[in-house]
Amino acid sequence: MTKHGKRIRGIQETYDLAKSYSLGEAIDILKQCPTVRFDQTVDVSVKLGIDPRKSDQQIRGSVSLPHGTGKVLRILVFAAGDKAAEAIEAGADFVGSDDLVEKIKGGWVDFDVAVATPDMMREVGKLGKVLGPRNLMPTPKAGTVTTDVVKTIAELRKGKIEFKADRAGVCNVGVAKLSFDSAQIKENVEALCAALVKAKPATAKGQYLVNFTISSTMGPGVTVDTRELIAL
């Protein structure tokens, strides 16, 4: 049997695919799976009981994870004048205005998150076809359209992330690294869940957290009992 086959078999022996687990149990399963040679990302996939076709049921927001994501973000800021100087001083990786807009129009997207001052949004809005599908478009709802670029950059460095439901009503979010302590992973997931529950549209009917799966980059997807999460 190949090393890959042995690893898959080892994963399959750690849990029951048909069973739902508590969040703590699910994290333990990920921790017990055969290791790989890099620090895997812990992702969650949440199916929400919404109709994304309705404008009042489109979920998008942000949350500050108590322990960060473990990822070093490449932050881009669209700003000019004093705000650009503030962004540079605050440690943004890329700062500019029309020059960055033109660069991105040419296909460059080598960054993880974009921030913009309100006065830049007329030009930044022209990048919708490039930034939108990559979930990189600054938005007021996510807190990435702001006059306080220093505060926003600091929050992003500390672990503020954006979440958004796709056309199927699913949110996919990276919340931690597998090397984090189990308690840290759990607290990050709980913070995300609390934010999702808070963002529930008033018009959404029936079960809201329909399905919740937690996984690692090379590990299994473990189903979590949503009753525990709704109670957060």
Curated annotation (Swiss-Prot):
A single BP term in Gene Ontology: regulation of translation
Which cysteines share a disulfide bond? none
Listed under GO cellular component are: large ribosomal subunit
Q: Does the record's keyword annotation contain Signal?
A: no
Q: Does the keyword Ribonucleoprotein apply?
A: yes
Keywords recorded for this protein, A-Z: Repressor, Ribonucleoprotein, Ribosomal protein, RNA-binding, rRNA-binding, Translation regulation, tRNA-binding
GO MF term list: rRNA binding; structural constituent of ribosome; tRNA binding
- Which InterPro entries does the UniProt record give? Ribosom_uL1_bac-type (IPR005878), Ribosomal_uL1 (IPR002143), Ribosomal_uL1-like (IPR023674), Ribosomal_uL1/biogenesis (IPR028364), Ribosomal_uL1_3-a/b-sand (IPR016095), Ribosomal_uL1_CS (IPR023673)
The entry sums up its family as follows: Belongs to the universal ribosomal protein uL1 family.
What role does this protein play? Binds directly to 23S rRNA. The L1 stalk is quite mobile in the ribosome, and is involved in E site tRNA release.
Annotated HAMAP family: Ribosomal_uL1_B
Q: How does the record describe its quaternary structure?
A: Part of the 50S ribosomal subunit.
* Protein name in the entry: Large ribosomal subunit protein uL1
